[in-house]
Structures are given as structure tokens and as C-alpha cells.
Design a protein with these regions (language model features):
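Short acidic-hydrophobic, aromatic-tinged amphipathic segments that line or gate anion-handling sites
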Residues: 524-540
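Short, contiguous clusters of charged residues that form electrostatic/catalytic patches at enzyme active sites
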Residues: 15, 175, 179, 455, ...
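Generic hydrophobic alpha-helical segments
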Residues: 73, 153, 457-461, 537, ...
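Conserved beta-strand scaffold positions in the cores of enzyme catalytic domains, especially
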Residues: 220, 442-444, 530-531
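Transmembrane helical cores of multi-pass ion-transport proteins
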Residues: 1-417, 421
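Active-site-adjacent beta-strand anchor residues
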Residues: 63, 505-506, 531
Length: 551
């Protein structure tokens, strides 16, 4: 910020004003779709938006409520009420802060792409499903809307004879306006244009045409200007235990979406965000937002891109966006009561379409079968069950896939005759050829020695079926070893000692050396059997063979 100029401030000011105006209809739509009042959506955009811009690790990230949280929030409110939502969001905030403090921001980026697309596509389908009632103006006659996907569609079909064609027309017109606006202006958001035009049109029809069948926000909510008021929810240990899985879902989804948004922004502006700082900011935002009546928030790709496209260069634009929304909440909020519910449904239809990434989804179906299986499992779990189940299963799948790929990259080879220097990439071998004495086997490990490959040694040795006098384990290309790997080596050493087979380690790097030394493995093996390179290891083996043969 040392080179920040007045011109930069004016650019950020204009970008912030535009983003604030763009964020207004989305905040209202996301709030209502989540099962809370429109004010709560705007409060979230104000509080979380300010904190994420002020403390975040990205210069241009815009935070606030997003479509990804609609399904989760709605489900929490149905089961635990508003207080449960507040507690779950604050817990998620703490989890996000911990992720950032322990520098796990980069780990989030390793979640496989098919899982992310499965999540987002599933969420898109679910958001679209939640808007069917408002698109068609269905009257459920007081019947409670089920939280699950299949239950919703059964209810819709049972009450499809109550279609309000006025709502249908408003929804179609709204979608049409949003779709064609970019052809006339890339900077003016279609959602804002649609809400202004449709709201004015419906108001005129109501006032001068006597048409009152189209539902508006004011028909369902009491809208008023208000100051931000702080209130801490009552904390109950039983509720905390029950809400912990949901909090994990909010935290993981928030982390994925915010870091994905920041990464997209980096690609456009040529910058690099700090993942861990961003997670800490997201965590603080989600901890503070519920205190003022907000809902879960994260980085929003659409608003972030609007910020960039309108010249936003620094966090000032995001702060201005929050201030603009605060002014709207204080002075213009009563006007929101005239916005038709079907128009907001049209906005969310476009949001769900953009979120679906159907072209990417279709492209991933051509990938290897394992990727396709992961994609479809995550997608259908998100749609048919809920996002909590999908994320839990998705993370398990991500871990399994990661372990599988690491296992595939770790190789163990056996050399029984000679080592060719032409095959050595690190110049460890200083001779023309190193002959391996009779009765000696050299095992070369290339990759991490962790629980996933610990049994490979046993498989290779049982396959060879012989019993050499000495085994040299060459570990120059082992970057790390875990407790299972240490246990495997210890067991191998103990079994070998019982069978009078000598074990020698070669080329252990400093990091692995410290771990093995700390574990007590070297006391079992003996310091004399730890060699810095293969030359030294073969010299020790040659002497040992000579002593064995002399007996």
C-alpha cells in the first residue's frame, strides 16, 4: 500500500460502489433461499465482506453469502433453528482459523478436481430445486416443505395444480433479462437490471392494473431499516456436539470456495494470494458474522470478478462494497419489500446454472473411470442426501485417492549383481561399476516410506523366496518416513536378526535420519550399519561377508 495513490483510491471507490450494488440482490436472494430474512443476507455481506477484505490474503477478494451455503443453512435451520445456525457458523469460523494457523491452506488445494465439480454441480441442482416453488408460485396449503431432494419433488408434483402463471411469467422475464444484459453491457449486472425492471413493472401492474397475484418479499417478510445489533447465542454442549459435523461441512466448503475464488482472481490480476491468511480472515468473518445476525460467508467468485472487471486493485474496494451495503440497509431497505419472489427465483436459476459447470462436468465424464466414479458419487450424494454426507465421503475419497497415487509413485527395486553408474542421477557411485558380493541384496526405495507402501518390502521378499546374508536398504530417495514405515523397518530388522540376516541402511537423508534416531531404531540396528552412501554400504557388506565365510 506504500505506492497507493489517489487515482487508485478513486478506482477502488467506484469498483466498491458497483460491487456493493451487484451484491445487494444476491445477498437478498441467498438470504431468503436459505430460510432467513433478507436483512440477514445483507448483514452477512456487510460484516463478513468487510472483515474478509480488511484481513484477507487476497487483494481483490469479495466475501459474503453464496449459493453454496443455501442447502446447508436451510437444513440447519429446519433441524436446529437460528441459534443452531449461529453456533455452527461460529464453530466453522474457529475451524477455519485453525486451518490457517496450522498452515493447511495449501492442503485444501489438493482436493481432487472431480470432487469439487461434484460438489458444485450437486449444489447447483439443489439450489434450482429449492426455487421451483417460487418459480411456479406453488401453494402448499400450509404443508411443510421437506428438506430432502426427493421429498421436495414429490411435494411439487402433488401441488402442481396450484401453479401461479403470473409468477412463471415474472421468472421467465427475469431470466431472459439477466441472460441478454451482458450483450449490451459487460459491467452492468443482469441480476440488478432484472430486479429493477421487473420490480417496477410488477409494482405498476399492482397499482394501476389491479394485478395482485404475484408474491413479493413484503408479502412474506417484514422489511425495515435497522442498525447492526450484536447478540451471542446460548451455547449448549449437547448442541455443540450435534452441530460439529455441520460446522466441519461449512468450514470445508467455505475454505474450498474462498481459495478457489482467490486462485481465479490471481490468474486474472497476476498476483498470488496467501492461502493461510485468507483462511484466518474467513474464519474471523464467520465467527463475527452470526453475532450481528449474519449467516455463513465465503469468498464469492462472481462478485470478486465484478470487482476486478471494474478496476478494483486493493482491499479498499471490498471495504467500500461493505459500506455501500450498510448505507442501503440503513436508508433504502424498505424498498426491498416490492421485489417479486419469482424475480429472485430467476436470479437464483442463473446462479445455479453458472455454478453447475455442466460443460466441465460433461468433459470429466470422458476422464479415467476412477475420476468419473468420484465425480458421480460426490454429485449424487450432494443431491440425494445432503452436503454434509457428500463432503465427509468426498474427503475420505480424496484421502484414499491421494494415498493410492503416492503408493503408485513409490517404487522398490532389487539389485543383486552390480550397480551401473550410468543409471545413477546423483553421482553417489564413484566407480565404473560396483559389484554386489554374493549373498548381498540391495533394495532401492524411491518415494515416501509410509503406511501405504510398508508391506511392499514383505511382498518383494516373499516373491524372491531366497535368504541372503545381507540386505542393504538404499534410502537416498526417501523424502520422509512415518510411524508405520518405522514399525515395518523395525519388524524387518528383528526378523532378519532371528534369521541371521544383516541389515544395512544407505544414503538416509537428514530428515529421515532424525526420525529414525529419535524412534530408537538405530539402537536396534547399530550405528555401524548406517552408511552415508552405497559405496560405504558395499564396503561394510564385503567385510561382513568375508567374516561370515571365514567362520
Amino acid at each position: 500500500m506504500k505506492t497507493y495513490t489517489k487515482a487508485d483510491f478513486m478506482t477502488d471507490l467506484m469498483a466498491g460502489i458497483i460491487v456493493g450494488i451487484v451484491a445487494l440482490p444476491l445477498a437478498i436472494a441467498f438470504g431468503i433461499a436459505s430460510g432467513v430474512s433478507p436483512e440477514k443476507g445483507i448483514i452477512t455481506a456487510i460484516v463478513a465482506g468487510f472483515i474478509i477484505s480488511f484481513l484477507g490474503g487476497s487483494k481483490v477478494q469479495i466475501g459474503g453469502p453464496t449459493g453454496a451455503f443455501i442447502v446447508i443453512i436451510y437444513g440447519i435451520i429446519q433441524e436446529y433453528g437460528i441459534d443452531g445456525l449461529m453456533v455452527a457458523t461460529m464453530m466453522a469460523g474457529v475451524l477455519l482459523i485453525l486451518l490457517g494457523i496450522f498452515k493447511l491452506g495449501t492442503v485444501i488445494k489438493f482436493i481432487p478436481y472431480p470432487i469439487i465439480i461434484g460438489f458444485t454441480s450437486g449444489i447447483a441442482v439443489t439450489i434450482f430445486t429449492t426455487q421451483i416453488a417460487d418459480i411456479f408460485g406453488l401453494d402448499f396449503k400450509g404443508e411443510k416443505v421437506p428438506g430432502d431432494f426427493i421429498g421436495k419433488w414429490i411435494l411439487y408434483f402433488h401441488h402442481f395444480d396450484t401453479v401461479n402463471w403470473g409468477n412463471v411469467i415474472v421468472s421467465v422475464v427475469s431470466v431472459f433479462i439477466i441472460a441478454i444484459t451482458p450483450k449490451f453491457s459487460k459491467k452492468v449486472p443482469g441480476s440488478l437490471v432484472a430486479i429493477i425492471l421487473v420490480t417496477v413493472g410488477v409494482y405498476c401492474l399492482k397499482m394501476y392494473g389491479g394485478i395482485t397475484c404475484i408474491d413479493t418479499i413484503g408479502d412474506r417478510f417484514s422489511i425495515k431499516a435497522q442498525l447492526l445489533e450484536a447478540a451471542v447465542p446460548a451455547l449448549d454442549w449437547e448442541a455443540i456436539k450435534n452441530l460439529f459435523p455441520v460446522a466441519i461441512t461449512i468450514a470445508v466448503l467455505g475454505a474450498i470456495e474462498s481459495l478457489l475464488s482467490a486462485a481465479v482472481a490471481d490468474g486474472v490480476i497476476g498476483d498470488r494470494h496467501d492461502s493461510n491468511t485468507e483462511l484466518i480472515a474467513q474464519g474471523i468473518a464467520n465467527f463475527v458474522s452470526p453475532i450481528f445476525g449474519g449467516i455463513p460467508a465465503t469468498g464469492a467468485i462472481a462478485r470478486t470478478m465484478t470487482n476486478i472487471n471494474n478496476g478494483g486493485k486493493s482491499p479498499v474496494a471490498g471495504i467500500v462494497h461493505a459500506v455501500v451495503l450498510l448505507l442501503i440497509l440503513l436508508f433504502l431497505m424498505p424498498l426491498a419489500q416490492y421485489i417479486p419472489m419469482a424475480c429472485l427465483a430467476g436470479v437464483l436459476v442463473i446462479v445455479s446454472y453458472n455454478m453447475s459447470g455442466w460443460r466441465v462436468f460433461k468433459g470429466l465424464l470422458k476422464n479415467p473411470k476412477s475420476d468419473v466414479a468420484v465425480l458421480l458419487i460426490t454429485f449424487f450424494l450432494t443431491v440425494i442426501f445432503d452436503l454434509t454426507v457428500a463432503i465427509e465421503v468426498g474427503l475420505v475419497i480424496a484421502c484414499v485417492l491421494f494415498m493410492k497415487r503416492v503408493m503408485e509413485t513409490t517404487k522398490i527395486s532389487v539389485i543383486t549383481d552390480e550397480i551401473d553408474p550410468n543409471n545413477e542421477s546423483d553421482l553417489e557411485v564413484h566407480e565404473e561399476h560396483l559389484m554386489i558380493p554374493q549373498g548381498v541384496e540391495v533394495y532401492e526405495i524411491n518415494g515416501p516410506y509410509f503406511f501405504g507402501i510398508a508391506t511392499k518390502f514383505e511382498e518383494i521378499m516373499s516373491r524372491l523366496g531366497d535368504r541372503p546374508k545381507i540386505r542393504i536398504i538404499r534410502m537416498r530417495k526417501v523424502p520422509f518416513i512415518d510411524s508405520t514405515g518405522i514399525h515395518n523397518l523395525t519388524t524387518l530388522c528383528e526378523m532378519s536378526q532371528k534369521e541371521n540376516i544383516h541389515i544395512i541402511l544407505s544414503g538416509v537423508n537428514e530428515k529421515v535420519h532424525k526420525v529414525l534416531e529419535k524412534s530408537g531404531f538405530y539402537e536396534l540396528l547399530g550405528e555401524e550399519n548406517i552408511c552415508s552412501n552405497i559405496n560405504e554400504a558395499l564396503e561394510v557388506a564385503t567385510r561382513e561377508i568375508a567374516e561370515i565365510n571365514a567362520k
